[in-house]
Amino acid sequence: MSLAEQIEQQQDDAGWSAHLQLRFVQRDGVTRLGAWKHFGPLLVQRPFYPEGAPCHVYVLHPPGGIVAGDRLELDIHLEPGSHALLTMPGASKFYRSIGPTARLAQRFHLAAGSTLEWLPQDSIFFSGARASLASRFTLEPGARLLAWETLCLGRPVMHERFDHGALDSLLHIELPDEVGLHERLRLEGGHLGKLGGHPLLATFCAAPANQAVLEQVRPLLDELGNPAGATLLGSLLVIRVLDHDNQHLQRTLQRLWHVLRPAILGLPACPPRIWAT
């Protein structure tokens, strides 16, 4: 093997891999964690049932940070009629990298009549991080979705800018008989013009939605005082918010969730206990 081939092999072997696969099923009117497999440090705590039938699960990433060459995969499958709410106790941190790109791939399959609430903490990209983030949601007929994603470039609370590094973020939401959402955001360190100079971007997606639901969220966005907007893509409601303050942005997302959960799911808000800590 040549020196160049050895270096390439070392780069490919850099970092570690982790994979978490969860399958939710409905049994006797209650959603259960029917099966789960994991490799590496991606784990889940035991399910919680603070509101009866829906299953609340916390996804854990014990090391707390993602570095050069790390590869994480999250694969979530909801069987017909099941309802799962997933969140995380902490942010996903992508640290400075001088090696291969760190990669996080998340796949969610919602079978007919199932419901997913994906409400993670933010993904923080330290200055110098090189990261790839890919999230794909596939909805079958009758499935319902409430999902948000928050990208934090740099550490605003520490006055640290994302001066160098790179982020490649993909978001796909596939709906039956509709176009859905297929987008890609590429950012280079020091060039946040696409975000109007804001270090924080949140995207909140809800389905199925209609014009009445859109009108419910617009007053909340109008009073924020920072750039925000909402639009309907068929039956998919897409909300985007820019901010300079992570805590303020998290409160905004939770307020939107308190509005959208009754509107989309017909259920009162039942915040995960971890939000109160």
Curated annotation (Swiss-Prot):
InterPro entries: UreD (IPR002669). One of its GO terms (cellular component) is cytoplasm. It comes from the Bacteria. It is found in: Cytoplasm. One of its GO terms (molecular function) is nickel cation binding. Pfam families: UreD. Its main location: cytoplasm. Keywords: Chaperone, Cytoplasm, Nickel insertion. The keyword Ribonucleoprotein does not apply. Belongs to the UreD family. Required for maturation of urease via the functional incorporation of the urease nickel metallocenter. HAMAP family: UreD. UreD, UreF and UreG form a complex that acts as a GTP-hydrolysis-dependent molecular chaperone, activating the urease apoprotein by helping to assemble the nickel containing metallocenter of UreC. The UreE protein probably delivers the nickel. This is Urease accessory protein UreD. It comes from Pseudomonas putida (strain ATCC 47054 / DSM 6125 / CFBP 8728 / NCIMB 11950 / KT2440).
